[in-house]
Amino acid sequence: MGSHAPAVAGKPDPKKGPYQATPWNIQLSATDTPGFTHVGNLERRSADRASDLVMNNHSKFHTFHDEIVGFHNHISHHVLTLWALGATPDEMQAAYDFNKPFQLLTYYNDPSVNIKLRDPEFFRQGLGNFELYGDYVRFFQAEVAAKGTQTVLHDYLFKGDTLTEDLLARLFSGFLHPLINLGFALEFQQPFLAAECLASTCMHPPYPAEFLTATEQHVECNGRPRSLPILSIAEGMRLDPVVATAVGPEDGNNRIADALLKRALKELIPHLSYFQVEPTEHDLARKTAEILQASAYICGAAQHPRKVEALDFVMLHSLTAAVFFPTIIKQEWISIETRARLLEWKGRSDLITYAALGCPKLYPDRITGYQPKQAATGWSDVVQRARVYQDDGHACKVIRALMCAENVCQPFEGEEGFPLKKADFLTVAHMTMDSVERMSDPNWVRQTEKVKQMSAQGRGQHSQVSAIMLRWVRWCGTEGAWDDFPDLEELSPSA
């Protein structure tokens, strides 16, 4: 994604014809853009179908599919993940067709709006305005075409001025979706996705600054403490009576900003300060492995002792965002200090997510003692199940992230902060697919009024959105979070 390559800045290279990635076009390649974590034998026909589907998503749909609640459009995430997992064109097409009925059509304003975005004041005033999303996309496409991906990402995220600090905080908002967008752009080397990432970032609120910059200020005033493992910090938060009780069942979907930070920000900051990343290649590698390890461990171990297994929907985003950091830490055009800062912010965001879940007690035996329904199968079978599973893409993203974690964490196995062994990642992958595939059991599906309200079904939202709510537990450490899940003894043999 060099800033001087013809495929990134300026006009497309005529020698390459239509098969190139530009600010206006997606083009994947089995040889050049398979992704950091991928299966073998990727095919050109799948690359072309994935490219076409992501382009279709861009031309038709908004980054959100619900402007009021803020539900995200995951089609590009889904398709790109399926591409890396070796999906066939038909499998990717099926995923796209399954998800398109509940998307929000994108829209554009008068071309003059795009021109106005060049005015810094108008640019700032438009932040958070969903109606300007398409205009921000066009603005950033033009920026990338003129300057190159690296320069534009630096100028709008890493420059260090007031605007970029604001946008950088927004990058960590919305269950980390803007950060995930950035990860896809970098891992799959698509300038087009970089423009969409920046536009999506502009749509999100800046509330992460409340704890991210405040923690940096705390460290600046009090000195850098000795860095502790994320899981040790999480346990300290669970034992903190203010932090552990800061959220409750009455809090809404955006309980990080609306509940946790309002009630426990002062108490949270010292805990967050214990996650430190040194600007060295060794610490970048170790802490990248640690955020993968910790998020995978919490996803698998944050269970209810008397309920069937389920992964927490909010926490799984920490895992599916961590999958991109092996790529991010290798972007040498980003200063090593900034890469360390991004990783630090990611670890601290994961800790905030854990606190927002209600600091759930972790049960490692639910991982080590788990008996998969298809115990004799390995990664290839789990991947195949994820490729054909009909959802909005979260299941296959979790599976790919667990594959990545198994690989990246292996050099640190057995060290402090790394409780999972190599085989445990596959076990959690089995747990993931077993839990979401239970949707086929009629005894599992409990379409309660609470679920309908959460999914906005009452005002015309598609029924698949409420189905998404049923696949995963939410805010798993709070009272009532598991009420709609069967007890362990209720599970039918066929489930």
Swiss-Prot record:
It holds the Pfam family Questin_oxidase. One of its GO terms (molecular function) is oxidoreductase activity. Disruption phenotype: Leads to the accumulation of versicolorin A. Keywords: Oxidoreductase. The keyword ATP-binding does not apply. Signal peptide: none annotated. The keyword tRNA-binding does not apply. It comes from the Eukaryota. Pathway: Mycotoxin biosynthesis; aflatoxin biosynthesis. InterPro entries: Questin_oxidase-like. Its EC number is 1.-.-.-. Residues 1-22 are annotated as: Disordered. GO terms for biological process: aflatoxin biosynthetic process. Belongs to the questin oxidase family. Oxidoreductase; part of the gene cluster that mediates the biosynthesis of aflatoxins, a group of polyketide-derived furanocoumarins, and part of the most toxic and carcinogenic compounds among the known mycotoxins. The four major aflatoxins produced by A.parasiticus are aflatoxin B1 (AFB1), aflatoxin B2 (AFB2), aflatoxin G1 (AFG1) and aflatoxin G2 (AFG2). This is Oxidoreductase AflY.
